């Protein structure tokens, strides 16, 4: 059983989108909200369905609730994050700060990822491959990211995950999150050509 627990601890950073760190890439958001990222997202995996609900907290911060499919017979793993955009050079990454204690991720730990909108209903998330120690400063992390962007080694090969949006979330002018509703213009499923 301990082997499975240790394996889960090793795999968790990859599932969440990167290694965990004590410090954020940037201490405050570099950009306003990207409303294309708001909504309920799903990822079909061998162990089941993982879901992420991304809602606005303010004009530049997100609330992310992540519920990962069970791995190896275990139960679902739920996480709550505060997230914001962190610009490094010309690239934008997301800093996610864990808001509650969990067995696999300490409260206050930071995880980084790159999000790429493929179309209105698909976002591709890629973990970052960083060798910096857990206590690296934001400046040290950004320096390593710039270096890895230049040499093409920032992203873990074949680790990108395509999440599908299944519902939208609306943000009212008063700053409250509106109700989740089915997509107004859902993308038709891709048809395979014979």
Predicted regions and their residues:
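Sec-dependent signal peptide recognition
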Residues: 2-10
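C-terminal motif of bacterial Sec signal peptides marking the signal peptidase cleavage site
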Residues: 16-18
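Calycin-type beta-barrel ligand-binding domains and close structural analogs
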Residues: 20-36, 44-194
């Amino acid at each position: 059983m301990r082997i499975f627990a240790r394996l889960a601890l090793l795999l968790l950073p990859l599932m969440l989108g990167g290694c965990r760190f004590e410090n954020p890439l940037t201490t405050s958001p570099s950009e306003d909200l990207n409303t294309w990222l708001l909504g309920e997202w799903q990822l079909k995996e061998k162990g089941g369905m993982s879901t992420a609900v991304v809602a606005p907290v303010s004009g530049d911060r997100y609330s992310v609730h992540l519920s990962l499919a069970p791995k190896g017979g275990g139960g679902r793993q739920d996480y709550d994050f505060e997230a914001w955009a962190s610009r490094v050079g010309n690239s934008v990454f997301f800093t996610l700060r864990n808001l509650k204690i969990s067995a696999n991720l300490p409260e206050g730990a930071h995880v980084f990822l790159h999000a790429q909108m493929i179309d209105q209903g698909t976002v591709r998330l890629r973990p970052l491959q960083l060798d910096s120690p857990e206590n690296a400063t934001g400046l040290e992390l950004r320096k390593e990211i710039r270096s890895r962007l230049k040499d093409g080694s920032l992203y873990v090969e074949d680790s990108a995950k395509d999440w599908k949006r299944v519902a939208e979330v609306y943000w009212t002018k008063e700053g409250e999150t509106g109700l989740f509703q089915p997509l107004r213009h859902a993308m038709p499923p891709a048809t395979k050509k014979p």
